């Protein structure tokens, strides 16, 4: 195994809360996939959920070396959870193409939050 990408992002949860208060679900609909959006809508702390997913997708885009744009969109990065609750990451479309370009085969992700911040780190590995 070799590491072919590493990205970290931190988000101030209050900024996401303020954005949601101003614009409703506009940011969520831009950032989240349909499956993630369904969880967001039903979540007891939707702004916190959105902040963690935003940080995770930004970290993934940094690990891919593109940021959001340049062929990779938020919609190409899917964040889920195992039955035990551990976060998972899956790439499609432009993000999958970029992962293949890097000879990457798998992404590892860690997401954490506390009162004010959400943070995520993504490591991409090759065989």
Swiss-Prot record:
Compartments in which it is found: Cytoplasm
Q: Name the enzyme's class.
A: transferase
Which terms under GO biological process does the entry name?
A: fatty acid biosynthetic process
Describe its function.
Answer: Transfers the 4'-phosphopantetheine moiety from coenzyme A to a Ser of acyl-carrier-protein.
Q: What is this protein called?
A: Holo-[acyl-carrier-protein] synthase
InterPro entries, per this entry? Answer: 4-PPantetheinyl_Trfase_dom, 4-PPantetheinyl_Trfase_dom_sf, ACPS, Ppantetheine-prot_Trfase_dom
**Which catalysed reactions does the entry list for this protein?**
apo-[ACP] + CoA = holo-[ACP] + adenosine 3',5'-bisphosphate + H(+)
Record-listed E.C. numbers: 2.7.8.7
Gene3D superfamilies membership: 4'-phosphopantetheinyl transferase domain
Q: Which GO terms describe its cellular component?
A: cytoplasm
Identify the cofactor(s).
Mg(2+)
Residues annotated for Mg(2+) binding in this entry: 9, 58
Return the similarity comment.
Belongs to the P-Pant transferase superfamily. AcpS family.
Q: Which HAMAP family match?
A: AcpS
Pfam short name (any one)? ACPS
Can you name one GO molecular function term for this protein?
Answer: magnesium ion binding
- Native organism is Shewanella sp. (strain W3-18-1)
